[in-house]
Structure formats: structure tokens, C-alpha cells
Amino acid sequence: MNKKLFIFGLSLFLFLFIFNLSLSLKLSSKNNFYNHNHINNQIHRNNEGNNKLSKLIHLHNDVIDTTISNRDNILFNKKSLNQKSKGSLFLVHLNGPIEKQVHNELIKQLDQLFNGGEIIHYIPDNTYLISMIGSDNNDNNNNNKIELINRLKELIPSIQWLKPLEPRLKISPLFKQNQFQGDNQNEIDQLRIYYHENSNQQSNDIDNIISESSLTLVEKELISNNNNNNNNVLITVNLKNSKLSLESIIYKISTRSLVYWIEPSSSKLIKHTPSNKFAHYSIQSGSASTTSTPIWDVIGIKGDGEIVGCADTGIDINHCFFYDTNPIGSTHRKIISYSSGNGDQIDEIDGHGTHIVGTIIGSTTVDPSVSEFSGGAPNSKVAFVDLQVGSGNGLSIQSNLTAIYQSTYDQNAKVHCDAWNSNIGPFYTGVTEMIDRFQWDHPDFLVVRSAGNNVNFGFNSIYTLSQESTSKNSLVVGSSNQPSSTYLSSIDYWDWDFIYNSIRTSVCTQGQSIYGITCSDVPTQTTSVDIQTQCCSNPILAKICCSTEIQQQYQTNSTVYSEFIPSLFSGVGPTSDGRLKPDLLAPGSPIISSRSLGPSSTINHCSPITSGIATSALIAMEGSSQAAAVATSAAVLVRQYYRDGYFINGKVNSSVGFQPSASLVKATLINTASINVDSTLEYSQGFGNIQLSKLITTTNAQTTSLDIPSSIEKADPIINTGETNSYCFSLDSKADIDITLVWTDPAGSPLSTFTLVNNLDLALLAFVDGELSIYSGNSETIFKNTSQVIFDQLNNVEVIRIKDAPIGSYDVKIFGTNIVIPNQSYSVVIRTSGGTTLMKESECAQCFYDPNDDQSQMCEFDNGIGTQYCKDDNRFSKCVVYECNTGYVFDNGITKSCVTTLALTLYDIVLLGIFGIIIVGAVIFVLVCYKSKSLDQNKYFSLSKDKGGDGNSIRSNSVAGNNNNNNNNNNNNNNNNNNNNNNNNNNNNNNNNNSNGKQSNIELNSVGGGDDGTPNGDDQQQQNNSPQYDEDGRLISGQEVEISIFEVISLGKPESKILGLALFLSFIDVALGLAVPLVAANIFDYLYAGETGKISTTILTFALIIIGMIIVQFLSGILLALAGHRIIARLRREMFASLLKQDMAFFNERKTGELMSRLASDVSSVRSIISDSIPHMIIQIATIGGTLIMLFIISWKLSLVVLCPLPILLVFSKFYGGYIEVISVKVQDALADAATHAAETLFNMKTVRWFSAEEREVAKFSKLISVSYKIALKMTIWNGIYSSTSGIFEQLSVFILLWYGSSLVSNGDLTPSMLIAFNLFLPFITGAVTQVASLYTTYKSYKGSSYRFFEIMQRVPDIQGEGGITRTKVRGDIQFNKVSFAYSSNPDQLVLEKIDIKFEPGTITALIGPSGGGKSTMLSLIGRLYNIDGGSITLDGTNIKDFNVPNLHEHISIVNQEPSLFSGSIAENIMFGKPTATRSEIIEACKQANAHDFITAMPEGYDTLIGERGTALSGGQKQRIAIARTIIKNPTVLLLDETTSELDVESEKLVQDSIDKLVVGRTVIIVAHRLTTILTADIIAVVSDSTISEMGTPEELLAKKGMFYDFVQIQYGKQGEELDIQLPSNSRNTRNADKLRNRSETIKQIAKINNIIPIHRPQRGDDDNEDDENNSGQGSSRSPPPMWRQAKKNANVNKSMLLTRRNTHVQHQSSSGGWQKGNVDDKLQRVLQKSRKKGFMNNQDHKDIKATLVLY
């Protein structure tokens, strides 16, 4: 019970341990397993950095730590909502990264719960600005909103933090900049107000504030329309007439619930100002000095079919670059639309717009000399928006820039050029948000924007980007210089007057500070003021507008005027959030292009260039605007490159062409760029200068390869959070690698410090020479460790460039790190160049094989997820199940898949059934086919008959002791005195004799007993052979004993059906039990998955299984118990029958108590083996088999490791079982000795009581019991050692499970639920193995204790009980023919030697002689209780060996000296002679036996119970009943063995009378010593010294004066004197009882007349000195000793006969001679008792008799 509690507690602990472990594993599963591969996982989220960063909300006016602020998270009430602007707009922070389904669910719930609530902006990190606007703002609505917010939290558990947007967070940081501080604060004359409008909550409150604050509404524009109910609106208001301070106005507006952003604006300070023969060479060939245009000339791309959008000052449509006779529209050569706010279609003189558009698309058909200065995309057209309000007034940009883009986009313009900027920067403002929003909404629309010209924005920074140029999605271009030769060529194309006047306007009119120039330095141009003179006279102006000074600078200052150097005026990044801007550089100084002549331009004006003199149709300009125009033309060429399919092989292939996205165009331009010079400003060059020639596949014998994933589906790939896309290639030669990733990012929020919304990451994995190198986007670091990779978290452009990349495999990885707005598209361009071969597409390396790192990844599996492991080819192995879905478990057997618990249980039952069928089949085979040696009845029919009659029969040794007197001894007794005898003693006697002389045998008290030695019928010729032993080393009667498992099982054959059914039910119980861990694992899965509703159903299944197990266990237990009871009853019956079939030698060798112990305890042991040990062992083996199946299905690795201690336990159990088997035999033998002693004591209880020997007997019994106790104590100690050792092995297995199993779970090799199941299965197998080991030792113990059972059951008696001839009647003619016989205990000492005697029918033959002479043995041989060693015994001439033994016994009967009665009634004892006898026959027999009278005198008469062994009767009564039993049998041959020797005179007379009646007409053989019995015989045979020394009638023998004569002298006390005895005639005709008795009376009368001769006493009690006390010196005068004594003395010459009863002490004749057996006093007491009964001596004569016997 304690063990079960311990296992249950341990299992519960492990369950909780694994449950907590699995929860932590679930939370970190993305760190342990991989969506695509191990390396992906390691580098995928390194850019997130510290987890704390993902908990921050980055706002311009605050950084909110949600882990600190969440203590009052969503603590909304009426008061707080009123205080927080009624709570219309909220910031909601979620646990990141944010997955697609979370985002979609948030949108859905906002719309449903808040009547059209929506996401307005994303704010890093993981935060959304959302609207939750109700129908009104009353108290009831606020209370309802609290409930809805809490409901939202419940529906979206990933919400970590949620609070209203506070007013302080809505104010732009521009208000704090220098340009709007101090005196300039008054220059803020406008505010831009962004608010969210809902149909349920209009902007009435804002309108009210405008009215109350005396603000003037300048403009109200819809900047985004998210759905039918919600809009984001921009309001621009004028502050000129307001009576309130700026701070008050801002505060009042910020408190409005609908407002989310406020920015400053100023009509005075904020200006939108505009910020190419040689440029063509630069962007196409990479250098202006290389006068080639391969994009135009080699592959023929000039922008055909492309439309460019542009918004600028206007276009001189009469210029030859644009002129067409067709009206502006789709048929116009260059301009398909012209939108002008003023309604004109002209540009100012030297207008910026004309120059920009000419740089992009300008081309002429009039003058070839001018065509050299055509635009970069000369075959393209333009959709133009005129932004100029008036000459010299700059640009008029409407508040909503998206309207500009929409107008050009509607004309199918996909590239738009903005060559202007405001002087606000470099913050991400509402203006920037609009630019990015439009491109997000139109992903094929690319805005190319100038980086701006260097302007001091009023803060201390070298970064000079404008708010527009901080746009993420726009291609922002900075200006780079062209070669000095280009500068010199452009000197005549500068409009110096225009430059001078522009400076004067900026300084004098607009008040701008330019290099410290004052208004007096730039007087108005007049006839008296020459601009060149004015410019050249001023050292500052000389560097700006003095042509000679500038020409000299062009020639001498190579530091500044060199190719690729960023222009000094070009805007420099980064942006305020640290992003890289500008993206690219393009030639912007100088650019010669079309010149506007203003309103006075003439049609198609385009004067030629003659003799190097500049034409008035062209003008040189510089600025980032010109660079933007050049880059725009390059973008147009790239679009055609993809649209017409040039990207495949440089030729038109429209079938593969597609419309590229803006991000692909941008990525391609950046991919071709290169940084050609070093710069002191880190962010000044972006990603370098454009070089489109890199797109050409073959140039100058170098090979360029492009991989454009967007071209596969003709659309950009899509990615979401947690996803990874891979593009892989290999290099066969060294080459340069350029990889560019660009995505159009959702618009950022002006509220946030950081603008990146969707975070993608680029990585390149290089596998070169077995080493892994990792490159990340925008990083120059090469990472070797995946955990150290750092990613760019700011830019939506990422670039990897590798110079001279070595041969190897390369995998490009695009990670969806945190896609907060789902379905982000992206573009990636992969280009290799410089190698001799093309890059080859290859299979992506799914992992990087590292022998020291077991890499794995998750994979899809039916009804579950799996894992894969990295192989040496950098590919993952086959998907192996890691975890099954809820309700499924993994079958690691045949199916290798996730199956239902029921299916796996059935599968296990099937396997277990097959296993059970094999086992049960083997058992049935044994039961049916194996022939049990123990139960085989044929063994009694297969005996070979003795070879009698020739004296040469073969005797086989079957002794349990020593075979001769010279063998070495093995003393296994408890004797206190050692002897020198060579006998093997197995007794507990304390006295040993040192004599080797012949031993005289005591007469057996019953037939087959006596003192002739232990009988044996084995052959004599093999008497010296080595003894035979069984498989365990035990000697067994010369016969092999089978105790194999098959023999044991076969004993249960009659109960095989019951046992088979019990085993079948037990197998069902095992199968049901094996389902329990699986059900428990299923419960764990449901608990783990949170599906608690299904747990109750599973628990019900669990309960049904338990109930089924209880029922099955009950039934199988009943059947096993029933089988056990039937087995024990049957085996006791079988054993008893086997005992009764044994020959008398068997019984002589064993004690009755021992046999009773075997019949009781040994049979119980066998029953325990058959019905307990073996079935339970089979059940436990089945449990082991089924459990092993399940354990190896779950995890073969864990199974092998956990079960490794068990073989040690099994080996230990094997040796321990063998030891227990041996020691169990000793215990059983010791208990048998004790039982034997107890049986003997109880059998002789009267003697014990008379001698008051109770304490002595108890002491002896205690001593014997202590022997078994000591042995059992030793066995108990070993049992304890074994139990503790086996327990240690069990706990060791549990420890290994905890250690190794947890590591397998953490490594993904094992699911948590399966580890739980494994833990629950482990006690099954450890318990079963322990049980098997215990049952094995129990089996060995029972086997040892049941050894004697099998010895008895399998012992084949030497005398065949079955078969042989049968006769219904015999004459009774018995003849001994040279019969020799020796007992098996002393085969060297013949008891009978060549005996020849004949017993004729109708005669009485008396056998007399010294005790131990062989008289009783002869009777036993006649009844064939033993086999003779030589000669033959015949009955009616037929050898008795040929007789059927039971039939032989039907003709022979015996009456023993001590009759054997049974504890039944008198009638039952008499019927033992004839079971079919009637009551009348019984009465008649009793009358003849003189027993009727005393029987009828008893209360119950013949039905009187006489008690055990007839204890209720006297000796004479028992003898007469025995005679009656013989009379009723009516035998032909009657054997009488001292029938009256123990009776008193009266009883003797009655018995003798009954004998006289019995002997008439039969062959009678009498063994007797009383003359009254002997003298009735016809023939007397004296048996002495193993032979018949005398034989004849009594008269003849008396006349011979031989041994019979001496016998008579002893009885009459006339030793040494002549007896004159007259015997009556004893003829057959005159003989009667009276005459026969007269013989005795005559002898007695003669003996009484003579005096008794004095007895000669010896000098020593143990001496045979023949001198008596009175005549010690006259020995010669003594009469010679009688022949009787001489015969005994002659017998001393022979070797002593050994008694073979194992526990009988044997004494030998002393060295001085004489014959005696046992204690002399005991013998004399017996002799005197007999003498008194015979009447030969009175009580006074007993001393003389004693002296005489001692003398002999």
C-alpha cells in the first residue's frame, strides 16, 4: 500500500513538474522551434533586443513604459473619462510581436463594440491609436464604455495596456524648434489640426473652438477615408485675428477628443521652394566621363510607354523638348495633362519646372545639337501639375498633398517627381504621413523627391532634410557633383543674372540669410550696375555668380568639383528618428536642360548650338531638384525594364513582363547604386550613386545575374509576423553580391518618435567551406553566431553588399519580424556580378549543420506538429511528430502518426493481444502437447521385469546415502560425536559406533518394515556406480526428476480452460490498464490547451476503464482461486495415489511425518506455482510487453535510458532466485524433520507420557525448528536486501526519467503530454519487472520447496504394480530357488544368500532364527514387496514377477505382530480384506476369529469407531480383528509374523485358537519364537547367517541337537544338559490342535524336573568372556556353548548389516564379540516380556536370563 502511495505521489509531482515545464516551453516555443529552420529562429528576433523595448510607447512628447503604467490600466470610471477628454481616442498596447489574427480581431471588435471604432495610426512599439467613439458623451455612455473596454480586453487577451490619448501628446515638437521660438513665435500664423471624424461624433466642438477663438478657417480637407463612417480630416486655421495666445489656442484644441495632432504653419516662414547631356552618362554608365548610354543604346530602353508625374513651377510648352502640334492630352507628344491653379500653361523665365521636366523626359525632333541634352527618359510623357501662383512667389502647395498625387496617378503616372521642399524638417509630420499614406494606398506609385538644398532649419544639427524628404516610401535623392569637365562645359549655360536676382530676392524681399550677404551687397540691376561686375567685386558673390571666378574654381578645386562627391548644398540625413536619407545620389550639379523663356517663348523654340556657342534654349542649374529629376528618369527606365520583360536577358519579352511595384523600382535603383567616394558625412550619400548599366546581364566579359522574386508571380511577395521567405543560390566563382530589400511601409504617425510600422529584416546566410557567415541588412558586420545578429529596426530599405564573395551556397532570408499591419508586400533584388558564371538557383539550406548543436524546427503533421533535425547537407530530416493536437496522442509504432487515444489504445490492445496469443498459445501447447512426467500413468506400465533365477540380475543404485563402506562421508547431520564410519549420516542421533562389523537387523513390526535394512530393488552390478543427481545437484533415487517450467505448467492441464479464461481476462485487464496513462495524457492535453469542457468526458472514460478493470480483476481473481483450489485438491489426490504405488523401499527410506509434510505443504507450493506464480508472471510479462510497446512508441531513446538498470535487476534476480531455490529446499527439509519428530512424538504419546518426556520432546522439537528458523532468517535477510535493491533500481529509473525526459521535452524530442504518459507507464514496467523478479524468486522458492513433490510424483517404483498375469485361484505351492537379497542401504551385505526352500500347500512352515536373520524379509519377498537380487520365487511354478501384483496379493495375506488398523469402525477395518463383504460375512469371520463376543459387547457393535490405529482396542482385540480381516479375505497363502508374541496368556489363547481355525487348508508360513507357536508347524526352518542352516520337523531338529535344540534349551532353561523329550506324532492324519500343543507341554514338563545351570557373568558388561564368575579358572571343565550361541558367534565374522532408515541410529557389535542390537537393557526387557507371556520363567528368574543373554 505504501509503495502504491509513493508511486502515486511521485507521479503527481512529476505531472505538476512537467505541466509547469510545458507551460514555459509553450511560452518560449518560438525560441525553441522554428517556423522554417533553426538559423531562422536564432536570428529572426535578435533585432528586438531587450524585451523591455517592446513594452515602450515612443511618442514625441513622452516615452511610456507600459510595465510601469499598467498598475492603473483600464481603471476607467466616470470621473476619469471626463478628465481625459471623454475618452474618444485611445492608445492600446499589445504584447508583441503582433500577429495577423490579433490585428484583424482588434479591427473587428472595435467596429462591433464601438459602432465603427477603428485603428487610426500605429505607434511603435506594438501600440495602436484607436477610436472608440460612442453616440454621445453623457455619463451613461461613459459607464457603458467602461464595460465595452473591459469586454475588449477579454476578447483580445494580448492587450496589455490601454489609456486615452492625453492632450500633451498631441502637440508637434516643431513648436519647440528655434524657427518657431522667440520673436519667430509671432510668425506662426497658421495651425494644421488633424482630427478623426465619426458619423456619431462630428467636428462641431472643433468648429465651436474656431469660432470662440476668432480663428479663421483656411482650408478643410479629407486626408483619408477609412470607411463610410470615419474620416481623418485636416483643418488649417489662420491665427491673425485671434484674441487668445498661441498656448491657449493649442491647449483648447488639444483637449478635444477628436483631435490627435496639431502642427504649426507659417505663410511667412514656411516656403516650398524648388530645391542634362552629362547626367545621362552618369546614371547609365556610372560616370559622366564615360560617354555611353547603354540603357538607351544597348537594350533600347528610353521610357517608352511610361508616364511621369511632376508638380512644379510650370512648363514652357513651346520649348522644343515638349512642343507638339497636338493639344495637351493623350495624343500629345510629351504632355498628357497639365493642371494649373491659375489656368495658364506657361512657366516663368528660367523656370524650375521646365528645367526639371526637360531633365526627365525632354527630347526634340528639331535640332540634333540640342538633343544631346535630352531628358533621361526621352520617350516618356508627363502628367504635370503647375504649383506656381505668380512669378517669384514660390510654389503654392495645397494642404492635402494627396490631391496632387491623385491627379497624376489618375493619368496613369506611376513615377512622380517632387523637386521641391519646405523649410521644415527633419521631423515626420502630418505632411510626411500624407505622402507615405498615398504610396501605401497605391503601391505601384513611386514619389521621387529631392533631398532638399542645404538649409538651416533652426536647430543645432548638420542634418538638413525637410519634412517631405523624411518620407519612408519616397525615393529621396541627393545631389552629387559631376566631373570638373562638365562644370567647365556648363559655364556658358549659367544664367548669372537669374542667380544674382534670386539671391537679391531671398535676402532683400524674403529676409533670408545667405552666407552673410546683406541687401546692400545685391543692389537692383540697372544700366549702371553690371551684375558680373557686382558679383565679381564681392568675395562672397564671386563664388556664386562671378563666371570667371567660378570657372577658375572649376579648374582648380578638384576637392569640391569632382565626380560623385555629394554636392555641398544637398540635403543631408538622417531623419529625426535616425533613418537613412537620402536614399540615393544622382548628378545634380550642374545639369543642363531646357530653358523656359517665360510668357514670351516662341513655338518650338530651340536655337542650335553652333561653334560651341551656348544656345538660349538650354540652361545650367544645380540642386537636389535636378538630382531628383535625373533619378526620376532612371526610375522610368527601370519600370520599362520590368514592364517589357528586359530583366530576363536584356531583350524585349512582353510575355514575362509585369507592372512593377514602386518598391521594386526603388529596390532596383538602390541595388545598382554604389558609393564611389568616401564622405565625411555618414548619411550624405545614402546607398550611393545610380548606375543602371549593372542591370545589363553581359558587359565587358563580366556576368551579371538577377533574381527578382516579384517576377515569379508578377507581384510582390507577401509576408506576415513570424513568417520567413527564403531565396537561395550558389556561386561557382567569385562574384560581387548585392541584395536590396524595400517595402512600401504603412504611413507612420506624427505622434511617434519612430516612423517604421512594419518591421521586415534581411539576412544573408553564407555557407562557405563548412563555415556559416551571416550578413544583415544595412550592417557591415559579419556575424558568426546566430544569437549575435543585429538587424535594422528603423529603415524600410535594407541592403547587403559583398565584394568578391567566395564560392559557396547563399540563402537570402526575409523575416516578418513584426508586421502590425498584415499582408505586407515587399520587393527584393538579388544581383551578382563580376563572376565568370551565373549564380545558380539552389535549394535553401534549412539549417547549418553543427555536430555540437542539435538544431531542430517545427513542421506540419497530420493532427499535430512535428520537428525536424539538421543533417550534414544543411537540410532537415523527415518531419517527426513533436506534439499532437488536443485529443490525439502519438503512435510511434507502425503508423508513426497522431491518432486518437482510442485508436492507440485499440492498437496497443491488438499488439498486446498478439503478444498474449503467443504466450497463451505457448501455455496451451504445453498443456495439450507436453506429456507430464508427474501425471503420466504409463510410467507404471513401462517397467522391465527383474531377471530372476540365475543369480545375475542387475541392481541399479537408488540409495539416498552411501553405496559402500569405503566412500568418503558427507556429514549433513547435527551429531555431537564424529564417527569413523564411512556412512552418509542424515540423522540427528548423538551416538555413533566405530565398528565396521556386521549389524543384526531388528524384526520389522510390519510387512516391509523391520530391521533388515532399507529395502531396495536395484541391481547389484551397478552398486558402485557414481550416484545420480538432478539438474540442481540433488541426488534422487537413481531416477531423473523433471522440474522444468513445462512440467510445472502441465500439472494444470485439467484446469487449462479455467486458467486460460483467467489469463484472457487478465490480458484485458492489462490492456485496460495501459489505456489509463493515455487517457491521463489526453486530460493533460485538454488542460494544456484550455479545453476544460472536454475534460469531464475524458474523466468519464477514465472512470469506465477503472470500473472495467475492477470487474475483470474480480472475475480473473475468482477463476484463478477456483483453479487453485481444484489444483490443490487434485494434486493431493494424485500425490497420494503416487505414494501408494511406491514400493516398500521408498517407505522404508522415508518417515511418515515427512511424507505428510510433502502431501500438505509441498502440494500447496506446487499449487502456488501453477495458479499464482506462473499466471501472475505471465500477466506481468504481458504488462511488460504491452508497456514496452507503449514506451517505445512514445520515445525509444527515453525507454532505452530509463530501462537500462532493469537488466541488472533481472540478472541479480536470476542468481537470487537460484539461491532462494536451494535454501527453500533446506527450509522444507528442516520443517519436514520437525514434522516427522512431531508425528513420532504424537504417535507414541502414551510412551512420552509414561516417561514424562514432554519437555525433552519439546526441546528436541525446538532444536529442529530452530534449524528451519535459522535458515528462514537467512532467507528473510536476503529477501530484505533484494527488496531494497529492487526498490533502488525503481527509484533510479524515476530519476533518469526526470533528468533525461525533461531534456527531451526541452529539446523538442518529446511532448509534455507524452512525458506524462511515460511517467505513468513507468510504474507499470518497473512494478511488473519487480513483480516478475519477485515472482521468479517465489517460483524458485516454491520450486525448491516442491522438489520432493516432483520426486514422489515422478518416481517409478521398482516393482511394477500394473500388468502381469492374473489367476483366480492358486494352489499355494511356493518355492525359493537360490534366492539372494540385500537391502539397498547395504548392498554389499546379503540378507539372504542362495536360499532354497519349498512351502507346500496345506502345510505349516515355521521360520525361526536370530533376529535380523532374514525371516521377515522372506515374507516380504513372497508378497513381492521387494525385488530379489538373484534366483527366483515361484507360485505354483510361475515366477511371482510375472504376476499382476494386486492379483498376487489377492492370494496372499499376512497377520503381523502389531496389527495395523485404521481409524474407522470395526466393520470398515474388517472389510479392508474384502471391500464387498456383507455384514453377515463380517460377523462370521469375527466368530471364527473369536472377536464376535467383544465386538457385540461394545455400544455400537460393529459400527464402533476404534480411533486412530485402533487405540480404543486392546492388543488381543486388535489382533483378532486383523485375523478376522484375513479370514474374510480367505487367502491361499497365509503369512503369520509373531502374531501372539506381544499378547498376554489369555489373549494369546484366544488368538491362537483363531489362528488354528485359520491355518486349516492353507499354505502357512509362520515367523515365531514361542514354542507353542513353533511346535504346531509341519516344517521348521532355522534362518541364520543369510541361509537356512536347519530345516525339518521339530522332532528331527531336536534330534540333531543343533540351533533349534539350543533354542529349546534357552526357553526351558536347560543349557548344557541333555533333554529327553518325547514328541507326539505329527502326521497329517492325526494332527490336531491338542496334539500339537502336547509337544510344548511335554517339553515344559521335562524342563521343570531339571535344575537351572548357574549363569556365568562376564567380567565386563560389554565383554563376551566365556568364563563365569564361579569357575573363572576352570574354563576347560565347562560344557561347550550351545549351537544356538555358536551360530550367533559365527555370524560375527561377517560384515555388519547397516540399517538404512535415515534417522535411525545404528549400533554395531563391540570389538569383544557377541551379538546385540540397540541398548542391551532394552533388548532384555523385550526378551523378558516375551518369556513371561510364554510362561517359561517366573519373575525371580529374570536376572539369570539377563546374565545369560549378556554372556551371549
From Swiss-Prot:
Residues 1631-1642 have a biased composition (Basic and acidic residues). Induction: Down-regulated by phagocytic stimuli (when grown on E.coli). Disruption phenotype: TagA mutant aggregates elaborate multiple prestalk cell regions during development and produce spores asynchronously and with low viability. They produce about twice as many prestalk cells as the wild type as judged by a prestalk cell reporter construct. When mixed with wild-type cells, tagA-cells become overrepresented in the prestalk cell population, suggesting that this phenotype is cell-autonomous. Its EC number is 3.4.21.-. The chain crosses the membrane at residues 909-929, 1058-1078, 1102-1122, 1174-1194, 1200-1220, 1285-1305, 1315-1335. Residues 1-24 form the signal peptide. InterPro entries: AAA+_ATPase (IPR003593), ABC1_TM_dom (IPR011527), ABC1_TM_sf (IPR036640), ABC_transporter-like_ATP-bd (IPR003439), ABC_transporter-like_CS (IPR017871), Galactose-bd-like_sf (IPR008979), P-loop_NTPase (IPR027417), Peptidase_S8/S53_dom (IPR000209). One of its GO terms (cellular component) is membrane. Disulfide bonds: none annotated. The keyword Protease applies. The active site is at 312 (charge relay system), 352 (charge relay system), 625 (charge relay system). The keyword Nucleus does not apply. PANTHER family: ATP-BINDING CASSETTE SUB-FAMILY B MEMBER 10, MITOCHONDRIAL, ATP-DEPENDENT PERMEASE MDL1, MITOCHONDRIAL. Required for a general cell fate determination at the onset of development. Required for the specification of an initial population of prespore cells in which tagA is expressed. Required for normal SDF-2 signaling during spore encapsulation. This is Serine protease/ABC transporter B family protein tagA.
